[in-house]
Amino acid sequence: MATNPKVYFDMTVGGKSAGRIVMELYADTTPETAENFRALCTGERGIGKQGKPLHYKGSSFHRVIPKFMCQGGDFTAGNGTGGESIYGSKFKDENFIKKHTGPGILSMANAGANTNGSQFFICTEKTSWLDGKHVVFGQVVEGLNVVRDIEKVGSDSGRTSKPVVIADCGQIS
């Protein structure tokens, strides 16, 4: 059986290095969703339909709500209205096998059923009310402290007090 891929984000907060987040992607249970995220970490698919690189590098976490989650992945508009998957625009909810069990869970942000693109969130708490609505496709395996530091610049509205940017990203294994 193939091992699940591991990818990383090297984060900056307010222009200063904040450390690395390493995530395991559940290719075993959500292969399509995991592959989308993996390829967006490496940037290997080139330019998307919207004329922007299909790559998380340089994009921000535009919505951070303490005691809830940190959301990013909108590399086209940067504000939560955009994003694009490697499959075109949006793709289906693959399954809801994995649950939002606690801090470090990686899940797809969406605008309703079957509207997955490139936006994702990392939970900072158990968020079981999202089970069956958002596809869980990975987990943080190193750098949860970095997620906690990002959480500190969030607010109840989701606006961050300092820019939170994926300065670099890619695949480890």
Swiss-Prot record:
Characterize the regulation of its activity. Answer: Binds cyclosporin A (CsA). CsA mediates some of its effects via an inhibitory action on PPIase.
PROSITE patterns from the entry? CSA_PPIASE_1, CSA_PPIASE_2
Phenotype upon loss of function: Increased susceptibility to P.syringae infection.
Tissue-wise, where is it found? Answer: Ubiquitous with higher levels in stems and flowers. In seeds, present in endosperm and embryo.
Induction remark? Up-regulated by light, wounding and pathogen infection.
The UniProt entry, under Pfam families, shows:
Pro_isomerase
Q: Which reactions are catalysed by this chain?
A: [protein]-peptidylproline (omega=180) = [protein]-peptidylproline (omega=0)
Per UniProt, which keywords does this protein have?
Chaperone, Cytoplasm, Isomerase, Rotamase
The record's listing under InterPro entries reads: Cyclophilin-like_dom_sf, Cyclophilin-type_PPIase, Cyclophilin-type_PPIase_CS, Cyclophilin-type_PPIase_dom
This protein's major location comes to cytoplasm
Q: Which domain of life is it from?
A: Eukaryota
A Gene Ontology cellular component where this protein is annotated is: cytosol
- Signal peptide, first to last residue: none
What's the top EC group for this one?
A: isomerase
| UniProt similarity note | Belongs to the cyclophilin-type PPIase family.
Instruction: Indicate the quaternary assembly.
Output: Interacts with DEK3.
What the protein does? PPIases accelerate the folding of proteins. It catalyzes the cis-trans isomerization of proline imidic peptide bonds in oligopeptides. Involved in reactive oxygen species production in response to pathogen infection.
Name of the protein this chain belongs to = Peptidyl-prolyl cis-trans isomerase CYP19-1
Species this protein is from? Arabidopsis thaliana
